[in-house]
């Protein structure tokens, strides 16, 4: 018999047989859930609950407690909606995994990458079920992560069958990369597009109605285009079919890249999943999901990959000592990432507490990664955006990043925030520690605040960078503008220099090895009080422009030092106070209509090779080696008339 029905909401007085309170039962009528209270629930029982909840479109809600799933990971390939409330700890891995490509049949092999190198056309195995002329795909085996050593950690290849038997398959084209334990499969739907699909297009011409429907996610795998980072051909993207008829596909978001002769392949992403509630999870992997939502949970380790339209926010990750604590890879569409605290990553190679790899269009706000540790010669950073996951060079195109606060990592490499391969991005409000911008194109980086640290800028093309740092290093770079306030000088190769410019390595868009920077504008305010300070030390730059924003202080040792290979430097009127290296290449600011100098000897003199020149009150032109204190100083001379 149930009593006290008027107890406050959430009361534990009056409990049903399944452990729910009366209020939970009432709430369940309005928003049906599958309620899990037994912390000793078995893996098979938990799977049965999840299957039934997915069938009915309901949420699996856990009661308070410490759940271990008997030490087993919990993996599903269907939509999973979890409510993990405050006071609940799911102390086991949860994996939601869709299919990168929908397949009909497949054959796994045990060949090593050495036995299946790039260019391979014949693969041993029983492929008698594969029709000649049909499309096949090749991917890494399920039990291997690939390796950058043979340029394949994530590659998929597509071709057609030239011959097949119970002993081998012959591919019509050689594999683009080596594959370890390659799996050969027949995709449910894949066609080769002939021609170019241009970046920013919404429409893919052709009749795809036999295999695709509205809402499907397709993978567009470039073959001959050169729109990857460094002009590479290895890139792909995922798009959602918004409408389709016999004339073609209209996609939900514009193409991020230009593709030439690409494959268009149907994926098997899980349609929607969510994890919310305020509780804690040991490990959550969301892979191959359309429109996943992960909100308001503590996740010791979070991995999101090959997803579309992600919504991830209000996350705290304490880390588990792996190379990254929160990781996003190949997330396409219109995604959101916000309000994330990530820490506790440990690595021996380049990685970070919060890492993103090739996530075009992602909007990122208010993240605070920290407490990262590297035990090797490379760094484990706080925040790292990368664009090379072998073999793919996919631009982080059209990203918006705002409000990243990090700290110096516990490692020999002191970089804390590293951005590589951004194109057409808006980045603002970066602070806390050393910032490194590399290989980015046509992007704006503003409000960088790291006054105690070096700011590194390498191989940027068409970028605008503004902010403050201790000192700055500019290597290469083309058609870019640097509006910087600097408070100190560097050490090592940057010794006593506020801003040093030197040779670059590779143009980010063309991939052409290019050491000479060109057409860069330096608007630098240097406020170092050191008597050894050199404001601008410039080498390996063609047509550098020293802008009107340049300022330094009287205590500086030198304003501009020119090193090797400085071609046609240009100076605009500026406020540098100390020596500037001479050279035959110097050109000045160009004007039309003349320059007006109003005033007299006090404020209208022109300094010319150490001489002050002015027009006296009587109209004569005069000169003096020191600034005149009258219209007729004792050391002045009349030039004429």
Swiss-Prot record:
Cysteine pairs forming cystine bridges in this chain are none
UniProtKB keywords: Degradation of host capsule during virus entry, Degradation of host cell envelope components during virus entry, Host-virus interaction, Viral attachment to host adhesion receptor, Viral attachment to host cell, Viral tail protein, Virion, Virus entry into host cell
What is recorded on activity versus pH? Optimum pH is 5-8.
The GO annotation for biological process reads: adhesion receptor-mediated virion attachment to host cell; symbiont entry into host cell via disruption of host cell envelope; symbiont entry into host cell via disruption of host cell glycocalyx
Where does the UniProt annotation locate this protein? Answer: Virion
| Domain of life of the native organism | Viruses
- Thermal profile of function: Optimum temperature is 20-70 degrees Celsius.
One cellular component term (GO) for this entry is: virus tail
**Has the keyword Acetylation been applied to this entry?**
no
Q: Subunit structure, briefly?
A: Homotrimer. Interacts (via N-terminus) with depolymerase 1 (via N-terminus); this interaction probably gives rise to a branched tailspike.
Main function: Functions as a receptor binding protein (RBP) and probably mediates the attachment to the host capsular exopolysaccharides. Displays a depolymerase activity that specifically degrades some K47-type polysaccharides of Klebsiella pneumoniae capsule, which allows the phage to reach the host cell membrane and bind the entry receptor.
Which family, according to the similarity comment? In the N-terminal section; belongs to the Przondovirus depolymerase 2 family.
Query: Can you say what this protein is called?
Result: Depolymerase 1, capsule K47-specific
Species the sequence originates in: Klebsiella phage vB_KpnP_IME205 (Bacteriophage vB_KpnP_IME205)
